A protein has these predicted regions:
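Short, small-residue-biased leader/transition segments that mark boundaries at the very start
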Residues: 2-5
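Generic structural signal for hydrophobic residues
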Residues: 8-9, 82
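Glycine-rich, acidic and aromatic/proline-enriched surface loops and short helix-turn segments
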Residues: 10-19
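Domain-terminus/edge residues, biased toward the C-terminal soluble/receptor-binding domains
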Residues: 18, 22, 33-256
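Conserved short loop/turn motifs at secondary-structure junctions
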Residues: 27-33
Length: 256
């Protein structure tokens, strides 16, 4: 297993686009020219970790923890302190991992959250731990001051869409996802305008999940992006007897 794990790690690295990384062991302590990575690749790996397993931040954000070490000779309590000093020294820092070797020097992959943004800062090759954390804090400061995000948390209610030749007269609609727009370079997002684009009517059959239209987001006349509007339920095409029944209903109700 010890020999097989680096093979799997290298395969996974390729899947993540870590093209400048090669693992020769599973602990990262090999002092070899064939065992290497880059800050960009560490950032890709870290992003994959916190996106797939966000609960890791519940643990990496702990500054101190009381641990009980149990052996055959008995148990002994001791205090475990986080090696990531940014947890206590930088507001919003919630992780992630420090590391150091004689060849790599002092390294850290740090995560911080502020104003609905999550930032990753990776530092490698620092001469000491103070420089490592100072550089990471500077990267955070630059990132948070340069970026802002718009999230549409107050989505407008969607109308029901008229359906022709369907067993139902209308179709339910729903948003495909929550709209988010990231502005970089210090750009300030102005007032956002939303426009719902839908046809006046559609013909059955309709399948749940198919695209019905979209919502377009603009600020200062520039389009920020859009989100698809999907059908929220199936609408089957009406048969002859369905149409006959509908006609008779309209006749007796005086709407035909």
């Amino acid at each position: 297993l010890h020999d097989a794990l680096p093979i799997w790690m290298n395969q996974k690295a390729k899947e993540l686009g870590m093209n400048d990384t090669k693992f020769e062991d599973c602990c990262g302590l090999t002092d070899s020219d064939g065992h290497y990575t880059t800050a960009a690749d560490v950032a890709k790996m870290s992003r994959e970790l916190i996106e797939r397993f966000p609960q890791i931040l519940n643990y990496s954000s702990i500054w101190m923890e009381e641990i009980t070490h149990v052996t055959q000779k008995g148990s002994k309590p001791f205090t475990l302190t986080n090696t990531n000093k940014l947890i206590r020294g930088y507001e919003g820092c919630v992780g992630l991992k420090t590391g150091s070797t004689s060849k790599a020097k002092y390294c850290v992959s740090a995560v911080a959250k502020k104003n609905d943004l999550t930032m990753l800062a990776v530092v490698m090759g620092a001469p000491d731990y103070k420089v490592r954390f100072a550089d990471a804090a500077s990267l955070f400061q630059y990132g948070f001051s340069s970026c802002s995000i718009y999230i549409d948390r107050e989505r407008d209610p969607l109308p029901e869409l008229s359906v022709v030749y369907g067993k139902q007269d209308t179709a339910e609609l729903e948003y495909a996802e929550e709209f988010r727009y990231l502005a970089t370079g210090g750009t300030v997002i102005g007032e956002v305008e939303k426009t719902i684009e839908l046809p006046e009517e559609v013909q059955a059959p309709i399948q749940k999940g198919e695209c019905a239209g979209r919502v377009v987001y603009k600020a200062d006349g520039e389009e920020l992006g859009s989100v698809a509007i999907l059908y929220g339920a199936d609408v089957a095409r009406a048969g002859m007897w369905d149409l006959f029944g509908c006609t008779m209903k309209q006749y007796f109700l005086g709407t035909a």
